[in-house]
Swiss-Prot record:
Species assigned in the record: Helicobacter pylori (strain G27)
Residue sites binding carboxy-S-adenosyl-L-methionine per the record: K25, W39, K44, G63, V114, E115, Y135, R250
Protein name from the UniProt record: tRNA U34 carboxymethyltransferase
Catalytic activity from the UniProt record: carboxy-S-adenosyl-L-methionine + 5-hydroxyuridine(34) in tRNA = 5-carboxymethoxyuridine(34) in tRNA + S-adenosyl-L-homocysteine + H(+)
Species lineage: Bacteria, Pseudomonadati, Campylobacterota, Epsilonproteobacteria, Campylobacterales
GO biological process per UniProt: tRNA wobble uridine modification
Enzyme Commission number(s) of this protein: 2.5.1.-
Amino acid sequence: MLICNDKFNPKTLLEEIMALRPWRKGPFEISQIKIDSEWDSSIKWDLVKNATPLKDKVVADVGCNNGYYLFKMLEHGPKSLVGFDPGVLVKKQFEFLAPFFDKEKKIIYESLGVEDLHEKYSNAFDVIFCLGVLYHRKSPLEALKALYHALKIRGELVLDTLIIDSPLDIALCPKKTYAKMKNVYFIPSVSALKGWCERVGFENFEVLSVLKTTPKEQRKTDFILGQSLEDFLDKTDHSKTLEGYDAPLRGYFKMLKPSKR
């Protein structure tokens, strides 16, 4: 949890926080008020925080949401830190949080998506984190290509995406929705993802972890509006989504942009 012990009027502070719902990423604690977000993002962070050193590196978080991971990255001493997310609400959440958790104003927040990286950030970063974005892209290869070109030579990508459990080079393409999400297009096997990444130009593809999403990590709280994981799974068989697909399984990966291609 990210904690700020500065003192504020608790009633006014809570009103501001609740006006910014839903809180997807967190948790945070400000002046003893806990923002109990839908996702316990510390679980994912613990899986990727030591994937590669961030000290004195130029680092990006593509799909940064409200900045939870950016604030955690600050603790590792990067040279600079840029977050990318086109969402309007999550930027407002970041602007609310930044005075508490980025008091030196080191983070740059860009309202851009992965497809916009080439406009300003070609060959710009030593490390890019892209967590929970790829399966939302209609063209995952184009997204990977954009990430590749945004990295410096010998730069590293830390990637998290939904995957399917299969030894084959295949991807699930949901018919209409996946776990009630309309914007999920391709969920690859690890082998298929490795092929995509290598086709774009990445090398040294490494599996950091594979983990099922559980209610410990994603659940309904007073700080979101609407449903969460428990509502997206088959009521009689939690190994399946409501649509009959396998329940969410996430893979965490690291790869390198090589010196030559």
